[in-house]
UniProtKB/Swiss-Prot annotation:
Residue span of region 2'-O-methyltransferase activity: 246-428
Localization (cell): Virion
Subunit structure: Interacts with VP1. Interacts with VP2.
Family per record: Belongs to the rotavirus VP3 family.
This protein's domain notes: Contains a bipartite N7-methyltransferase domain, a 2'-O-methyltransferase domain and a GTase/RTPase domain. The C-terminus contains a phosphodiesterase domain that degrades the 5'-triphosphorylated, 2'-5' linked adenylate oligomers produced by the host cell in response to IFN stimulation.
Species for this entry: Rotavirus A (isolate RVA/Human/India/116E/1986/G9P8[11]) (RV-A)
Protein name: Protein VP3
Ranges where the record places region 2'-5'-phosphodiesterase activity: 693-835
GO terms assigned for molecular function: GTP binding; hydrolase activity; mRNA 5'-cap (guanine-N7-)-methyltransferase activity; mRNA guanylyltransferase activity; RNA binding
Region annotation N7-methyltransferase activity: where it falls in the sequence: 171-245, 429-555
Keyword Mitochondrion: no
Catalytic activity, EC: 3.1.4.-, 2.7.7.50, 2.1.1.56
UniProt keyword annotations, A-Z: GTP-binding, Host-virus interaction, Hydrolase, Inhibition of host innate immune response by virus, Methyltransferase, mRNA capping, mRNA processing, Multifunctional enzyme, Nucleotide-binding, Nucleotidyltransferase, RNA-binding, S-adenosyl-L-methionine, Transferase, Viral immunoevasion, Virion
Catalysed reaction equations from the record: a 5'-end diphospho-ribonucleoside in mRNA + GTP + H(+) = a 5'-end (5'-triphosphoguanosine)-ribonucleoside in mRNA + diphosphate; a 5'-end (5'-triphosphoguanosine)-ribonucleoside in mRNA + S-adenosyl-L-methionine = a 5'-end (N(7)-methyl 5'-triphosphoguanosine)-ribonucleoside in mRNA + S-adenosyl-L-homocysteine; 5'-triphosphoadenylyl-(2'->5')-adenylyl-(2'->5')-adenosine + 2 H2O = 2 AMP + ATP + 2 H(+)
């Protein structure tokens, strides 16, 4: 959903678009709530309130002021992520395909021969980090850039087994044009940048678990973050390999040697960060042309000092010369050294060339060892070739993708490796490594152990659900870690599957009720965005690849109606009710009937069940941005701080009724996951609320009327407004509550329209207009620790006779209250009040 705020209506009609005019009779929160439950994708918001826009954005719903037709046309035709704190829009718009154009935000790609393999007549355009170079295309009242690129296709091709790039590109573009937009992947880079800068403003020590290559630029400027990944491939791991021969396989049609070198250096940078938590100087030998340095400098300001007889245009300091052993003393501490020296083969015979390469490999290793043998805070990444070698057993082996699989690979060494025991590795084993192992991640840090860290803020995005982790250990970490943002895969199955297949692994699935957290927010991706200053135009869909975002230790926990709130809670219900269901009242009818309340007159205005909780349960796959457990808990302890809107505090029994309705809904839908979720939410309600029932009552509250439009044979027909189980010394407490409620009690617009047999020999009249006041009265008694109401649903009725009678229907008749009293069952009246 996107909300585009206009001062004036527009003449043009757009598909999937609805107009909402600000309702001045309602406050900004109520307007925001009504907007959020509209069912179209585009909302044109007229006569808008800036505060309402702010409320929507905090809820993760993109809402932007529009000042021109061009702004409207641009935003209505595509999806986007919005940084509402600095008024920047990141478009995810692929309409540039109509210019016969693909885009990249990695400069090195433009220096390859990739254009020879594009679709006929197509070109490649460099657009800068997150499309920053496109800002000049949009002369808008807000900052706007198009973050959409085709780097995902290019990178997927590089790691695939396919060689024909044009065929691969064509298939992927067609897929993109015929499937829904992977909105979270597109906005994730924007989110990660905002997230980690926000966290580091308030937390000095941050742990990040499970980063992948898509984050490789994000953390270049954040050296103090401690990374955990899947670990490195070490020399000692080669013992499992069987010897092989040279393969000579082509990986890419266009030259990706630049990409390989960039990955090698970035891997080394992050390895250095995890040791020293600061930025190193970067020395490079055999550096030309290293166009990728430009890419790294777009994200962070590194000092590159390079040696090569050829130019290295983006280096900070370039020595246009060869590097010799005597130059090692020029290399400072707090640095990394990348050795990529190799002489061109020219016309050399392959045997002679092989000797040169092996000699150069030994020379490269000697430079590395000498560099690491003195000084401090040093890491080296060195090019090696498959040959008989002795290497430290803790050497980290790298084999990032390159244009052709030949004989080369790389090794990362640190000052500790130099003094570690060495192992002889034969040439054939190195070929087995080269032929079979691809380094898929620039993050080669050790795996994260599922233990709390009291002084650290832990971030684990899409990293802990894998079934090689203990599910209970993941739950324990989330329950016990004081400060964190952790995601887990949401249980989106209908059979309540404990784990699901994802790509080539299995993930555990989770529901919010799996966690016993207090002070945590459990929400969706878009709900989490709102907490960190972003919003999005396309809300999470139940794709099966959905995650719960669990935020521990946030100062926004008590801001119940601002973040992870109830915005959009009824949107899915509206979509169904007004398009597919038997009636738009179907939800109200079902909730009453499933709780044995058969009086459906006015069910849409006087329902006996919490619609919020019911919708949050049965449609949790669509509206899990709303943190239901937090909402229940804060109400239970009386700390539901609400800024605005039509606020109605539910009685705890209404929440129980909602769970019962949701369970029956789940049974009818054969939805075992909702069934368990509803059961567990009901159990949670009973834990946080101390609900007691007057199932063996000794007092009741009665209402007498001046007019009863039916025949009756009881002495005085009355409406029982509720029963109590109290001791005699609590009578005054009950009377105090009744006196406080007196104005509302006498304002009740009670009416009746039919009679029926409540049970054998009990003939009653229905009573409408009672429930909302009953639940308010229930809440007041609950807060006063007075047992009021039974475990079965309260059905308002007036007893007319204790004999069988025929049903009577009349026009709805208003009943006037004459008195309200408290009476002991089979005893005397102890309190009576009249208007």
């Amino acid at each position: 959903m996107k909300v585009l705020a206009l001062r004036h209506s527009v003449a043009q009609v757009y598909a999937d678009t609805q107009t909402y005019v600000h309702d001045d009779s309602k406050d900004e929160y109520e307007n925001a709530f009504l907007i959020s439950n509209l069912t179209t994708h585009n909302i044109l918001y007229l006569n808008y309130s800036v505060k309402t826009l702010k409320i929507l954005n905090k809820s993760g719903i993109a809402a932007i002021e529009i000042q021109s037709p061009d702004e409207l046309f641009t935003l209505i035709r595509c999806n986007f992520t919005y940084n509402y704190e600095n008024n920047t829009v990141y478009l995810h718009d692929y309409s540039y395909y109509t210019n016969n154009e693909i885009r990249t935000d990695q400069h090195w790609v433009t220096k390859t021969d990739i254009t020879n393999y594009l679709l006929p007549g197509w070109k490649l355009t460099y657009v800068g980090y997150n499309g920053k170079n496109t800002r000049g295309h949009y002369k808008f009242s807000f900052i706007c850039q198009n973050a959409a690129t085709d780097d995902d296709i290019i990178i997927e091709y590089i790691y695939s087994n396919e060689l024909d790039f044009q065929t691969f590109l064509l298939r992927k573009i067609k897929e993109r044009m015929t499937t829904s937009l992977p909105i979270t992947r597109l906005s994730n880079r924007v989110f990660r940048d905002k997230l980690f800068s926000s966290i580091l403003n308030t937390h000095k020590k941050v742990i990040n678990v499970g980063p992948r290559n898509e984050s490789m630029f994000t953390f270049l400027n954040l050296p103090t973050i401690k990374q955990f990944s899947n670990g490195a491939y070490l020399v000692k791991h080669t013992i499992k390999l069987k010897q092989e021969r040279w393969l000579g396989k082509r990986v890419s049609q266009f030259d990706i040697g630049q990409y390989k070198n960039m990955l090698n250096v970035i891997t080394t940078i992050y390895y250095y960060y995890n040791l020293h938590f600061s930025k190193p100087i970067i020395y490079m030998l055999g550096s030309a042309p290293s166009y990728w340095i430009y890419d790294i400098k777009q994200y962070s300001d590194f000092t590159f000092e390079t040696w090569d007889p050829l130019d290295t245009p983006y280096s900070t300091t370039h020595h246009k010369e060869l590097f010799f052993d005597k130059d090692i003393n020029r290399l400072k501490d707090n640095s990394i050294l990348y050795i990529d020296i190799r002489t061109d083969r020219g016309n050399m015979d392959w045997k002679e060339w092989r000797k040169v390469v092996e000699h150069q490999t030994i020379s490269n290793l000697n430079i590395a060892y000498k560099y690491l043998s003195t000084g401090k805070a040093k890491v080296c990444c060195v090019k090696l070739t498959a040959m008989d070698l002795e290497l430290p057993v803790t050497t980290k082996l790298l084999h990032h993708p390159t244009t052709e699989v030949r004989s080369e690979f790389y090794a990362i060494l640190d000052v500790w490796d130099v003094n570690t025991i060495k192992r002889f590795v034969p040439k054939g084993v190195f070929y087995a490594f080269i032929n079979n192992v691809i380094t898929e991640n620039v993050f080669i840090q050790p795996p994260f152990k599922l233990k709390t860290s009291s002084n650290d803020y832990i971030v684990a995005l899409y990293a802990l659900s894998n079934d090689f982790n203990s599910r209970q250990d993941v739950i324990n970490l989330i329950n016990q870690q004081k400060q964190s943002l952790i995601t887990v895969r949401m249980n989106n199955t209908f059979r309540d599957e404990p784990k699901v297949n994802f790509k080539n692994i299995y993930d555990w699935t989770f529901l919010p009720t799996d966690f016993e957290t207090k002070g945590s927010i459990i929400t969706s991706y878009d709900g989490c965005l709102g907490i960190f200053g972003l919003s999005i135009s396309l809300s999470s869909k139940p794709t099966g690849n959905n995650h719960l975002f669990i935020i521990n230790g946030t100062d926004k926990y008590y801001k119940l109606d601002q973040y992870a709130n109830h915005m959009g809670i009824s949107r899915r219900s509206h979509q169904i009710r007004f398009s597919e269901s038997a009636t738009s009242y179907s939800g109200y009818i079902f909730r009453d009937l499933s709780n044995n309340n058969f009086n459906l007159i006015g069910t849409n205005v006087e329902n006996s069940v919490s619609g919020h909780v019911y919708n949050a349960l049965i449609y949790y796959r669509y509206n899990y941005a709303f943190d239901l457990k937090r909402w229940i808990y804060l109400h239970s302890i009386g700390k539901a701080n609400v800024e605005g809107g039509r606020y109605y505090e539910h009685a705890p029994i209404e929440l129980i009724y909602a769970c019962r309705s949701a369970k029956e809904f789940a049974i009818l839908q054969d939805d075992l996951t909702v069934l368990r979720y509803a059961n567990e939410i009901e159990r949670y309600i009973n834990i946080v609320y101390n609900i007691t029932y007057a199932d063996d009552p000794n007092y009741f509250i009665g209402i007498e009327f001046t007019n009863i439009p039916y025949e009756y044979d009881v002495k005085v027909p009355h409406l029982t407004l509720g029963v109590l189980f109290i001791s005699d010394n609590m009578i005054n407490d009950v009377i105090t509550v009744l006196k406080k409620m007196k104005p509302e009690l006498f304002k009740m617009e009670i009416s009746t329209s039919y009679t029926y047999m409540l049970s054998d020999n009990i003939y009653v009249a229905n009573a409408s207009g009672v429930l909302s006041t009953y639940f308010k009265l229930y809440n007041m008694f609950y807060r006063s620790h007075i047992t009021f109401g039974q475990s079965r649903m309260f059905i308002p009725h007036i007893t007319l006779s204790f004999s069988n009678r025929q049903m009577v229907r009349i026009e709805s008749t208003r009943l006037k209250i004459s008195s309200i009293y408290l009476r002991k069952i089979k005893g005397e009246t102890v309190f009576d009040m009249s208007e």
